[in-house]
Amino acid sequence: MAEPRPLTIALVAGETSGDILGAGLIRALKARIPDARFVGVAGPLMQAEGCEAWYEMEELAVMGIVEVLGRLRRLLHIRADLTRRFGELRPDVFVGIDAPDFNITLEGNLKKQGIKTIHYVSPSVWAWRQKRVFKIGRATDLVLAFLPFEKAFYDKFNVPCRFIGHTMADAMPLDPDKGAARDRLGIPHNVRCLALLPGSRGAEVEMLSADFLKTAQLLRVTYPDLQVVVPLVNAKRREQFERIKAETAPDMIVHMLDGQARDAMIASDAALLASGTAALECMLAKCPMVVGYRMKPFTFWLAKRLVKTDYVSLPNLLAGRELVKELLQDECEPQVLAAALQPLLADGKTSHEMHETFRALHQQIRCNADEQAADAVLELAKQ
């Protein structure tokens, strides 16, 4: 008699963040079903957990329209090949991790062949291009969402969605150790500290750094002992920031860090940052913040017409109100930014209330996401 086939899960991750999620999911599934088989497109972390890589994740990690066009034939070939091979393999469940432009079409192809599909990490359909929700609904049996308002959005369109909490909320403590973070960064315990995070993309750093530095200069008038830390994602961004600083504030002392954004947030009394995942991380670090963002005028005009939400930062979207100041475009200028940061650095009622709300929101999205994702995969496999 033939051996029963082990549970087989196909996965496709297209970037580093997806590799981290995939590895966590595989680990949680292996703890319950040790002989489960995992195949697909995987990064080094997923492969270390035992995922058999038919293609390396780097093949899909392409940024920018020009780069995508240059690699389009190869990407279409990979998607067609995966459609065929997964169709022959008949996995119990297919999990597309993020990379929506690649994965949602692949999920649709597989669902048509009777393979159960999950899309892990909702694209920002609630914010813009909302009609994508119908394509997602046709392509997937289930969406796994990090944030509760994402589930509420899918529910409106009767697209099956499960809120599993956010892996970053699981990874970060409810009460971070500010003193230990300062020790790691060499910041004295008895001074005020401001973190500047002008973004991870070159265009953001170019657009925001000068105003962020001028803001810190204004705050130093009120707080002469203010320490300023600037975590930068890589050597390229550091070089870029150093050039802008030399032009804008050559005499100003700032501590530039290679990475270490999380420590910088935990160590600081307040942060000024570009929007994006950094705002969520800053909330989880319990660091009061102001979001400042500027883009090219036409891009901003277009964004205002396309974006359907009242807020741009995740803390405000989670709170359903303006919990943190969002100063965008013309409002993103040093005088206005400094005035918004002043009460946060004063360490009074405003920053205390923000800290308490951040803690409550952290608890709301801290749900053991890896385990929840594994539950969802196994439940769908049994259906």
Curated annotation (Swiss-Prot):
**Keyword Glycosyltransferase recorded:** yes
One GO MF term, please?
Answer: phospholipid binding
* Keywords carried by this UniProt record: Glycosyltransferase, Lipid A biosynthesis, Lipid biosynthesis, Lipid metabolism, Transferase
Q: Which reaction does it catalyse?
A: 2-N,3-O-bis[(3R)-3-hydroxytetradecanoyl]-alpha-D-glucosaminyl 1-phosphate + UDP-2-N,3-O-bis[(3R)-3-hydroxytetradecanoyl]-alpha-D-glucosamine = lipid A disaccharide (E. coli) + UDP + H(+); a lipid X + a UDP-2-N,3-O-bis[(3R)-3-hydroxyacyl]-alpha-D-glucosamine = a lipid A disaccharide + UDP + H(+)
Q: In which pathway does it act?
A: Glycolipid biosynthesis; lipid IV(A) biosynthesis; lipid IV(A) from (3R)-3-hydroxytetradecanoyl-[acyl-carrier-protein] and UDP-N-acetyl-alpha-D-glucosamine: step 5/6
An example of a Gene Ontology cellular component annotation for this protein is:
membrane
Query: Enzyme class, one word?
Result: transferase
Please give the biological process terms from Gene Ontology that the record holds. Answer: lipid A biosynthetic process
Q: Does the keyword Transferase apply?
A: yes
Task: Spell out the PANTHER family in the cross-references.
Answer: LIPID-A-DISACCHARIDE SYNTHASE, LIPID-A-DISACCHARIDE SYNTHASE, MITOCHONDRIAL-RELATED
| Family affiliation | Belongs to the LpxB family.
Q: What does this protein do?
A: Condensation of UDP-2,3-diacylglucosamine and 2,3-diacylglucosamine-1-phosphate to form lipid A disaccharide, a precursor of lipid A, a phosphorylated glycolipid that anchors the lipopolysaccharide to the outer membrane of the cell.
NCBIfam families, per this entry? lpxB
Its recorded name reads Lipid-A-disaccharide synthase
This chain's source organism reads Klebsiella pneumoniae (strain 342)
